[in-house]
């Protein structure tokens, strides 16, 4: 969950849900709008758990900032979607689809997802250091890949506001979590700079 505070499912829970869906003939719908398209370090986050959904929603990253979304499904799940059953006034916009194709070309380039994983490990290591350095400010690090969350002991809005004053744009989420969603092509030097700004923010707010 992104809005819920970067809450990750466990492998056991996901396998249980997949099994329940199989046993009852229920479709498993996976929302990859925030965590998909490489943000987790794999093309789709569910790949980390070897779980295959029946329906999957994707958006945000697929458009690279351009409004675009898609719904993917297995053949069995889409059997009722015959011609005329689904449509939208501006669906299939040629410009949006061209942008999406170019985004996919970049994400699928050799080394792109590997770099996301590498930067994720580096970023997480640096932020765990911040947790140790500022125990009165930070409580927990959450997330996968470059979809990370810092649970704060102070009000998360106070943290994001002070970060904004330091020219760092962060997003608050539920459970008093600050979301950190850097671009997937972030460099090691840029990670260091973000951590520097996080440290300055924490210094301003620590008790």
Locations of regions flagged by a protein language model:
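Conserved N-terminal phosphate-binding loop of PLP-dependent enzymes in the Aspartate aminotransferase
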Residues: 1-207
């Amino acid at each position: 969950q992104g809005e819920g505070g970067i809450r990750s499912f466990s492998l056991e829970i996901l396998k249980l849900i997949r099994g329940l869906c199989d046993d009852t003939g229920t479709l498993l719908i996976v929302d990859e709008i925030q965590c998909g398209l490489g943000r987790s370090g794999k093309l789709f986050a569910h790949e980390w758990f070897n779980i295959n959904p029946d329906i999957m929603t994707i958006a945000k990253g697929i458009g690279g900032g351009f409004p675009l979304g898609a719904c993917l499904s297995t053949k069995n799940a889409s059997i009722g979607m015959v011609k005329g059953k689904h449509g939208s006034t501006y669906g299939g916009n040629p410009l949006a689809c061209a942008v999406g194709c170019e985004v996919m070309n970049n994400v699928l380039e050799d080394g792109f997802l590997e770099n996301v994983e590498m930067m994720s490990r580096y970023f997480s290591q640096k932020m765990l250091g911040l947790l140790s350095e500022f125990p009165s400010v930070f409580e927990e690090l959450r997330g996968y890949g470059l979809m990370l969350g810092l649970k704060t002991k102070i009000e998360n809005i106070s943290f994001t506001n002070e970060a904004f004053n330091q020219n760092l744009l962060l997003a608050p989420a539920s459970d008093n979590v600050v979301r950190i969603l850097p671009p997937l092509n972030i460099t090691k030097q840029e990670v260091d700079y973000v951590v520097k700004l996080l440290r300055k923010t924490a210094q301003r707010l620590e008790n």
